[in-house]
Design a protein with these regions (language model features):
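Extended Gly/Ser/Thr-rich low-complexity repeat segments
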Residues: 84-100
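Short, Lys/Arg-rich flexible segments
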Residues: 1-83, 100-103, 107, 111-170
Length: 170
């Protein structure tokens, strides 16, 4: 028995295919944008969780997140030095427990700037008294949150594309 497969092409069928592909491309692009925005917000929430877990929740109001619709990019950041010191670590304790990714903007980070070493130093506390420390280990809340999102990004993208593309998604 002979099997025959035929396919008919016409101007109309090609125009319909083009419409379908354009619709798919727009929906796919929107899904990717939604995934970036959602992942940015998730990372922000994970940073907050790590801050609470490390006992620095009173500084979380200084952590921000933003999604730029024009650039289609998101970011999570802070200018709060307490959070930055906790992220990177300080003193002899920090140099013995450094940040797992000392590259980028913190490549030149110095743990024991004033060379206090084992003797440590006094610092003013919020209640007006002074505390003593040898420094802080790196608690890397931002780095850990980024690693978490990096591990989840495939699922995030898949879900967001399915939401926008729907039945068109393979």
């Amino acid at each position: 028995m002979k099997t025959l497969l035929t396919m008919e092409l016409s101007k109309k069928s090609l125009e319909e295919a083009k419409k379908f592909l354009n619709k798919y491309q727009e929906a796919y692009s929107k899904g990717i944008d939604n995934a970036v925005k959602y992942a940015t917000e998730m990372m922000y929430n994970k940073v907050l969780e790590y801050c609470y877990a490390n006992g620095i929740s009173n500084h979380t109001s200084q952590i921000q997140w933003q999604y730029d619709d024009n650039a289609k990019s998101g970011r999570v950041w802070t200018n709060d030095m307490v959070i930055i010191f906790n992220e990177m670590g300080t003193g002899i304790v920090g140099s013995n427990n450094p940040h797992p990714n000392p590259d980028g903007p913190f490549k030149s980070w110095k743990y024991d700037v004033n060379e206090h070493g084992e003797k440590g130093w006094k610092y003013p506390k919020e209640d007006g008294t002074y505390g003593w420390t040898k420094g802080l280990p790196s608690r890397h809340m931002f780095y850990s949150a980024f690693q978490d999102i990096k591990n989840e990004i495939g699922n995030i993208v898949d879900i967001e594309i399915r939401k926008t593309v729907g039945d068109l998604y393979w």
